[in-house]
Amino acid sequence: MAKQVFQTTFAGRELIVETGQVAKQANGSVVVRYGESTVLTAAVMSKKMATGDFFPLQVNYEEKMYAAGKFPGGFMKREGRPSTDATLTARLIDRPIRPMFAEGFRNEVQVINTVLSYDENASAPMAAMFGSSLALSISDIPFDGPIAGVQVGYVDGQIIINPSQEQAEQSLLELTVAGTKHAINMVESGAKELSEEIMLEALLKGHEAVKELIAFQEEIVAAVGKEKAEVELLHVDAELQAEIIAAYNSDLQKAVQVEEKLAREAATQVVKDQVTAVYEEKYADHEEFDRIMRDVAEILEQMEHAEVRRLITEDKVRPDGRKVDEIRPLDAVVDFLPRVHGSGLFTRGQTQALSVLTLAPMGETQIIDGLDPEYKKRFMHHYNFPQYSVGETGRYGAPGRREIGHGALGERALAQVLPSLEEFPYAIRLVAEVLESNGSSSQASICAGTLALMAGGVPIKAPVAGIAMGLISDGNNYTVLTDIQGLEDHFGDMDFKVAGTRDGITALQMDIKIQGITAEILTEALAQAKKARFEILDVIEATIPEVRPELAPTAPKIDTIKIDVDKIKIVIGKGGETIDKIIAETGVKIDIDEEGNVSIYSSDQDAINRAKEIIAGLVREAKVDEVYRAKVVRIEKFGAFVNLFDKTDALVHISEMAWTRTNRVEDLVEIGDEVDVKVIKIDEKGRIDASMKALLPRPPKPEHDEKGEKSERPHRPRHQKDYKPKKEFTETSKDSE
């Protein structure tokens, strides 16, 4: 295939697509240039159906540091495991693509996005999403696309598509919306307490922009697209299906309608085990035994799926007996743990999350060094989902993509209400431990996080709560569900998570299993979510009405002082020698920013005060008219040098030592003496003159005796060679050394 180039303008930037030049052995490949961001996307499909009961789709987003003209960090100087941002971007692309493959498609598909050049003002993730859809669409892989995605901002009351870096920093909204030309099928958002109306407007305008990109893709597919391959889809034997439904459907229906989760799971498993045993015995010697038993398992899954959906759409009954807009029982607890800086335990039905707060000096912030310029991340929200939370065994180790994604969602939801660095100069870490799960654990972690922050004395603007909405749709009719549980999530069509305060939304996330949802469904889901959010906030506020006024006793205390920027090097010292010495002596932690803000942390207030005194002394400057208790450190004929504080010395001229005339400095002071002095002058070079006599009472003028004669005083003959007329010193002499 010869190279072909397609070009358009989108959101004020050039969008160029190249095909037929690189990665030609892949089923489909494109180079997407958006602004100066360049992404290569290659899509590949396996030749045969994979084993397993799921569609093995893998989407990767690879950040090459050369794309931004940077070296990778670390000893190896080579890209390693994907960054958190790369993992989240891969999930962002996967989610709108996955619903676009046929039911029963089991061939393995890999979509690899490689960032070759990076322009921070032209979204590489959106170029990668565009490229992923297009590479699949022009390939022979049976992909029912195209899809596209855009980023949406909200600045000065205006909706902005694919905002620049500067606009993004000013925006009250960070939204990614993706979909087909007919409907939205993926949403990811953080927002600064925006209303449902503004969020809906942003979603709909984002979808209008998505349609533009899809039209451009369709033009390219028409020009270079391949014919789709014929692949085998997983299907079950129709006669076997009819036989099992006739014999066991009523038993499975009864089991599904058991309200309590564990009892329901046990009841359905009894039916499944019974059916499996019957057919294992019946077909034990059959040459296609494995295929038949796979079909039996799939048929039972389909029967359970159908019954759950029938109950909700026809009978308006949910598996646990709730109404469609009813929340499960709620419980909130603070101070679940001693010693930690804050903790909250939130329970919703059989979903339970424990959130633990840790506060630390700003030196503990996470340094993010990716394609964007390096920056420090002050707030971290980590989410852990152990297998015991669902009563199962399983893998333990590093967090997977799902845990990283759920942690990031909670982080976005809570970050919007955190105090500024000036108000609260701490690094903040929340860890959510999911202790039980029956759906919506990510939203439980947000509620638990709010409890932990408030209990820990972090002055958040307002409590945040989260709720997960679901959808059951048969094409003509639909039902929106509030607070979905695991079964409704598994067999439903939508998982729409909404978090926020009483004033507005702080985070959204939507994934669907159908090809899209309408504005009508979005509107209804947002309205139901708002009502539910307020109910949850009532419970949180009843548990802890307001943020505690003080931090936990175990949390590090902080004091901040401001120093001149040119004094920073004095506090740090050569090679960090001075600051390390202060830390060693006092046991505190110290952070200094480039603006001269010095933050001192410790759980011991006395240690903070001591460190503060030392630093204040290091950067202290003498001032005219200030009085100091000084130590004599050097004596010269013309006066004495005294140490005012730390490394700051002053000269007390001999004429400023006493009101009476003195010939020898040693007659008044010795090295090591401590004397009170007053600063009387600081010259342009910073040299300091001080006075002892300025702090002494001035003696009265000499008076005549009764005979009218003057009182005796030392007399020096005028003919003496070195005689000089006495003069009053009104200012001190300069250092004559």
UniProtKB/Swiss-Prot annotation:
Mg(2+) binds at residues 489, 495. GO terms for cellular component: cytosol. GO terms for biological process: mRNA catabolic process; RNA processing. Its main location: cytoplasm. Its cofactor is Mg(2+). Keywords: Cytoplasm, Magnesium, Metal-binding, Nucleotidyltransferase, RNA-binding, Transferase. PROSITE patterns: KH_TYPE_1, S1. Residues 625-693 form the S1 motif domain. Residues 700-737 have a biased composition (Basic and acidic residues). It is found in: Cytoplasm. It catalyses: RNA(n+1) + phosphate = RNA(n) + a ribonucleoside 5'-diphosphate. SUPFAM superfamilies: Eukaryotic type KH-domain (KH-domain type I), Nucleic acid-binding proteins, Polynucleotide phosphorylase/guanosine pentaphosphate synthase (PNPase/GPSI), domain 3, Ribonuclease PH domain 2-like, Ribosomal protein S5 domain 2-like. GO terms for molecular function: 3'-5'-RNA exonuclease activity; magnesium ion binding; polyribonucleotide nucleotidyltransferase activity; RNA binding. Residues 691-737 are annotated as: Disordered. Residues 556-615 form the KH domain. Its EC number is 2.7.7.8. Pfam families: KH_1, PNPase, RNase_PH, RNase_PH_C, S1. It is an enzyme of class 2 (transferase). PANTHER family: POLYRIBONUCLEOTIDE NUCLEOTIDYLTRANSFERASE (PTHR11252), POLYRIBONUCLEOTIDE NUCLEOTIDYLTRANSFERASE 1, MITOCHONDRIAL (PTHR11252:SF0). Involved in mRNA degradation. Catalyzes the phosphorolysis of single-stranded polyribonucleotides processively in the 3'- to 5'-direction. HAMAP family: PNPase. Belongs to the polyribonucleotide nucleotidyltransferase family. This is Polyribonucleotide nucleotidyltransferase. It comes from Streptococcus pneumoniae serotype 4 (strain ATCC BAA-334 / TIGR4). The gene is pnp.
